Regions:
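Flexible, glycine/small-residue-enriched loop-and-beta-strand segment within the central core
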Residues: 42, 69-78, 82-174
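LRR N-terminal entry segment and analogous cap-like coil->beta motifs
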Residues: 64-68
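Switch/coupling sub-region of P-loop NTPases
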Residues: 177
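Terminal amphipathic alpha-helical/low-complexity segments used for targeting or macromolecular assembly
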Residues: 1-56, 61
Length: 177
């Protein structure tokens, strides 16, 4: 499972969530803590670069948010990010520098590293996407098993029980879907 460890999947210099990710070995271990991390980090963001736009919603002044986009907190939209028409951020979302969240894309409990693109008709839930990861049109990170049992991550070497009912995907840096 060495390949699935945070240190091997993600360049932590490319996410504002590095202090959270550094505390854990595997990406799924981070998911239950995204919400509280955002709240703590948001209150510490520099006011000259970020503005608070509602309860637990911080948006970089250099970011672009379409008037038809819906942002629910807690969330952080980092610098130069673009939130396009009808994007829906349900909460517990970190949107990295230069990231694109497009038309009819929904986010829930996610970390999008810098320059991630989820540009149209995507669902990204309970997931972590690495630097420059890109999800093509209509791709989703299904986050609940059809039998509603806990998610097990499997490899040739071993199986690891995550203890989670909801776990979408862990896309490493520069992954294309």
């Amino acid at each position: 499972m060495e390949a699935m460890k945070i240190r091997n999947l993600y360049n932590l210099e490319e996410t504002i969530a590095a202090p959270l990710l550094e505390q854990y070995e595997y990406p799924w271990e981070v998911l239950p803590y995204i919400k509280e991390f955002i709240k703590a980090l948001g209150n510490a963001l520099p006011e000259d670069r970020f503005e608070k736009r509602g309860e637990d919603i911080w948006v970089a002044k250099s970011a672009t948010v379409a008037p038809t986009a819906c942002l629910n907190g807690p969330c952080i939209v980092d610098e130069e990010a673009e939130i396009r028409h009808c994007a829906f951020v349900r909460g517990s979302a970190i949107i990295g520098k230069g990231a694109v969240v497009g038309n009819s894309t929904e986010l829930k409990n996610v970390i999008l590293s810098n320059k991630v693109q989820v540009p149209h008709y995507n669902y990204v839930g309970d997931s972590i996407l690495g630097y420059k990861a890109h999800m093509g049109a209509g791709s989703i990170t299904s986050n609940v098993k059809s039998d509603k049992t806990l998610v097990v991550v499997k490899s040739a070497e071993e199986n690891i029980e995550t203890g989670l009912k909801k776990f979408g995907a862990m896309l490493g840096d520069c992954v294309e879907v």
